[in-house]
Amino acid sequence: MGLCKCPKRKVTNLFCYEHRVNVCEFCLVDNHPNCVVQSYLTWLTDQDYDPNCSLCKTTLAEGDTIRLNCLHLLHWKCFDEWAANFPATTAPAGYRCPCCSQEVFPPINEVSPLIEKLREQLKQSNWARAALGLPTLPELNRPVPSPAPPQLKNAPVMHKEVPVHNNRSSTPATHLEMEDTASYSVSNNDVTFARKKNYGAESSSDTRPLLQLRDADNEENKYKRRPTMDWMRGLWRAKHGGSGVPQERASAKKIALFVIFLAVLALITIIMVMKRAGYSGEHSSDPLFDPMANPNIRVAVEDSRLPHV
């Protein structure tokens, strides 16, 4: 950091390599337009500098110069020709300094004397005006040299007679049938594309609403507990599509399989509940089912001492 010697007495970190003084941006624009200027810390690291243009390798004092936002100095003519070789579709961020690869166009919200002068210089070329969003000017277009036609010296002229055949065979007519027909219409303001496809009985334009009335989520239903059927319906929609699909498109086989699955699941649940309740059929250890323990039941007991008839 240093203090500029101009009447403004501004504290600055810019340093002029040629005059070896600290300069502010106002002095840089007015009094040091063709001097090599970098930060003071850069000068402390390396005091050597190149007074030539990085593009044409000639002295910077020989022509008009442009100082980029990174403080690198180049000939305006060399820089204009270098940037004009970029494609017309190059984005503003694609233009970068050939020395340090920093963006050429400064941010829109950044304001300083150096940036204001840089923007004024860039407006003198159509490639920069297009990148800045300004209309291009015809007088700023670069002249395109027309290629000179090749000159033929002492070239012999050969005349060759081509026989004319009157008995040419007629070309058979060819009929092309295309299923898809595409047509487009272009205007000055917008571009409209129309395409028609043949899908049998189905029409290409579907005017069904994306959301049905039952899909609406009211405020009063937002925090209401959902019934079980809504939960089942949500699973069905997640598996086989939303409610916007017509019923005739649903597969009857899938519906039947889903109903059978629910019936089997309910049957298994009932069997497990009854088994837990004690109706499994194993009553050998239960005294209530022992006929010998019931006093109302008389069972004849065979005596081995009685004679058999």
Swiss-Prot record:
Its main location: membrane. The chain crosses the membrane at residues 254-274. SMART domains: RING. One of its GO terms (molecular function) is zinc ion binding. InterPro entries: ZFPL1, Znf_RING, Znf_RING/FYVE/PHD. This is Zinc finger protein-like 1 homolog. Keywords: Membrane, Metal-binding, Transmembrane, Transmembrane helix, Zinc, Zinc-finger. Signal peptide: none annotated. It is found in: Membrane.
